[in-house]
Curated annotation (Swiss-Prot):
The keyword Metal-binding does not apply. Belongs to the GARIN family. A motif (Bipartite nuclear localization signal) lies at residues 494-511. The modification Phosphoserine is found at residues 378, 634, 636. GO terms for biological process: acrosome assembly; cell morphogenesis; gene expression; single fertilization; vacuole organization. The gene is Garin3. This is Golgi-associated RAB2B interactor protein 3. Residues 188-202, 361-378 have a biased composition (Polar residues). Interacts (via N-terminus) with RAB2B (in GTP-bound form). Interacts with FRG1. It comes from the Eukaryota. It comes from Rattus norvegicus. The lineage of its organism: Eukaryota, Metazoa, Chordata, Craniata, Vertebrata. The keyword Nucleus applies.
Length: 647
């Protein structure tokens, strides 16, 4: 026996499938051995046969009325490998066919020329699924990772073995063992069957019609091809990485959704007109870790407090953060105009978590509304589990009612697994917790509001109790003297009404001139001619003081100033305007101090004439926006500080 015939026995002597590969050398193997074009296959164990291409129904596919012959060869790139890893496809060369026709025409029909094959395909077996299509007709089915399927029928030569197809059946079960043998004891795989189990999983992954994974297999094909051309020195690539090729999906390592509702409490107490209500809201968090991504949301805390007859609402929290890993995207939206903040993130379509947190705060009309919301939702399609959690805090404040509401709700659903009972019902759970309080505000007691300085100026009069509050530091002796004089002068006030008008007209004609010279006259004194003239003026001022005290008493008795006689309206308005401008000096500048003046003559003089008219008007203009928020106590006190001089 020649060395060529001993070659397969030599290379397959220690091979695991030596029963299949202990055959004579075929045409393709002989051509590769002699040609030396592919050194990697020169001493490689091979098992080859000739096939013709057919359709799924078993019909012969002919191209240009010719049968398509295909030589299928299963080989191993290295004798170290436990299983073959490469499939070679070859066809008769065109040049060889033309040469055979010419030789047959020259030498006759009995001449049988040597057959030359052309190597067309080199496919790693991990991307090819070989199965038995029809045992009786000796047909095989080849399904590639690209999704294409070919049907081949064995066409042995005349000198081939009769049980050649049985060897192909053994080889198919060697490359792809039955599913029962893999599932029988999957926890303890042997060294020989571990690769077979992996090959089975690979073949199951690349099912019929899986055309979406074409672009993913190119890298693995190049890697396997380079490993094959390396002479078998490199080991077989990791099958764990192969299992992921052909599937365009990511599996999450775990998804856990936890919901918590803590601190839903409401307290309401009434002490007088005071009520307090508190509610602290709920938090939900969900986390998912793995290749799909992760999302976290925590927050949504709201609090509301109400004290006394007035209510104040506060809402804090509603912060959301979303984090994504593994190519996922996160989005956050802020709308400051509407007072709404939202944040959320999506994850993978297989199993993921979606979380959102939002808060709103607005004041429609006289009321206030503050709400806080957070929620999470997770779903695992593989385990058929889903969970939802939501927490809400709301506070509504109006003029009469304060409403505080806080609550949390969680929903979980779990469908029965495929291994369990097929008629089982899904397990669902719902937890709801709410707490709220309502505080009703009673009508506030009517509080007297003090008039504004600007209002008093427009109305044309000055309230006595305001002036009494500003100049309330007068001595008790002065008050007693004023009361005695008021009682004594009240009787003669009516008789001297005509004299009062005359003195008032005289005093109004002098205007600022008499006001400026009065202070100078009271301090230093001038000639007797001026003193005689002003003596009458002092008498008129004394009568003016009596009439003003009478008018103040009438106003204290709630009599309207507009109901006075129209005949004396002109004189009274002028005199009231002067006294009003004088009193405003005490309201705006309460720190004014009255100085005691001395003179040789006796009588009553107005000491506050030291304040000029320009200063009074400027001070009043600056005090137009002044508002008295406190309650004014009504006291009957004189606004004019008088000083009695010895005669």
């Amino acid at each position: 026996m020649s060395s060529e015939c001993l070659l397969p026995y030599y290379t397959a002597h220690s091979y695991r499938s030596m029963g299949v590969f202990n055959t004579s050398m075929g045409n393709l193997q002989r051509q590769l051995y002699k040609g030396g074009e592919y050194d990697i296959f020169k001493y490689a164990p091979m098992f080859e046969s000739d096939f013709i291409q057919i359709s799924k129904k078993g019909e012969v596919i002919d191209v240009h009325n010719r049968v398509r012959m295909v030589t299928v060869c299963i080989a191993s790139t290295s004798p170290v490998l436990p299983l073959p890893d490469v499939m070679l496809l070859a066809r008769p060369a065109k040049v060889c066919e033309e040469h055979a026709r010419r030789a047959r025409f020259i030498k006759g029909r009995g001449y049988k020329p040597s057959k030359t094959l052309e190597l067309t395909r080199l496919l790693p077996l991990k991307f090819v699924k070989i199965s038995i299509h029809d045992h009786e007709k000796q047909q095989l089915r080849l399904k590639l990772a690209t999704g294409r399927t070919f049907y081949l029928q064995l066409c042995p030569s005349s000198d081939a073995r009769e049980d050649l197809f049985c060897y192909w059946e053994k080889l198919v079960y060697l490359l792809r063992p039955p599913v029962n043998s893999c599932i029988s004891n999957p926890s303890i795989p042997t060294a020989d069957t571990s690769t077979e189990t992996k090959s089975t999983l690979v073949s199951e992954i690349h099912g019929e019609g899986d055309r979406d994974s074409k672009f993913q297999t190119s890298q693995d094909v190049s890697e396997a091809t380079s490993a094959a051309f390396a002479g078998g020195e490199r080991t077989q690539p990791n099958i764990a990485a192969i299992l992921t090729t052909g599937l365009a999906k990511a599996r999450a390592a775990g998804a856990a959704a936890g919901t918590g509702a803590a601190g839903t409490a409401g307290t309401a107490g009434a002490a007088g007109a005071t009520g307090a209500a508190g509610a602290t809201g709920a938090a939900g968090s969900a986390r998912a870790a793995g290749g799909a991504g992760s999302a976290r949301a925590a927050g949504a805390t709201g609090s509301a407090r109400a004290a006394g007859a007035t209510g104040s609402a506060r809402a804090a929290g509603a912060t959301g953060s979303a984090r994504a890993a593994g190519g996922n995207t996160a989005a956050a939206v802020m709308t400051p105009l509407a007072g709404l903040a939202r944040a959320g993130t999506p994850t993978s379509p297989v199993s993921g978590v979606i979380s959102i947190a939002a808060t709103t705060s607005k004041s429609p009309g006289s009321g206030q509304v503050a709400t806080g919301l957070t929620g999470t939702a997770s779903k695992d399609q593989e385990r058929s589990e889903s969970s939802k959690a939501m927490a809400v805090v709301a506070n509504i404040t109006t003029e009469s009612v304060d409403v505080v509401l806080a609550g949390a709700a969680s929903f979980t659903s779990e469908s029965p697994s495929a291994e369990g009972d097929a008629y089982g019902s899904p397990d669902t759970g719902l937890n709801v917790a709410f707490a709220g309080s309502i505080t009703t505000k009673g009508p506030a007691e009517d509080k007297p509001e003090a008039p504004l300085v600007s209002t008093l100026q427009s109305e044309g009069y000055m309230c006595e109790r305001d002036g009494s509050q500003k100049v309330s530091h007068t001595s008790s002796e002065t008050q007693k003297e004023k009361r005695e004089r008021r009682e004594s002068d009240r009787k003669g006030s009516r008789k001297s009404s005509h004299h009062q008008r005359t003195g008032a007209s005289r005093h109004s004609s002098s205007k600022d001139k008499g006001r400026k010279t009065s202070s100078y006259r009271s301090v230093s004194g001038h000639g007797k001619t001026r003193e005689d003239k002003k003596e009458k003026g002092r008498g008129s001022l004394r009568d003016q003081r009596h009439s003003s005290s009478y008018r103040s008493e009438s106003r204290t008795g709630h009599k309207s100033r507009k109901n006075r006689p129209a005949a004396s309206g002109g004189f009274v308005s002028k005199r009231a305007t002067k006294i009003r401008s004088f009193f405003r000096a005490f309201l705006v500048r309460p720190t004014l101090k009255t100085e005691n003046t001395s003179g040789e003559r006796g009588g009553v003089d107005i000491v506050t004439k030291l304040v000029e008219k320009q200063d009074i008007e400027t001070t009043v203009e600056k005090s137009k926006d002044l508002e008295f928020s406190d309650t004014m106590a009504s006291e009957s006190m004189e606004k004019i500080i008088l000083e009695t001089k010895p005669i």
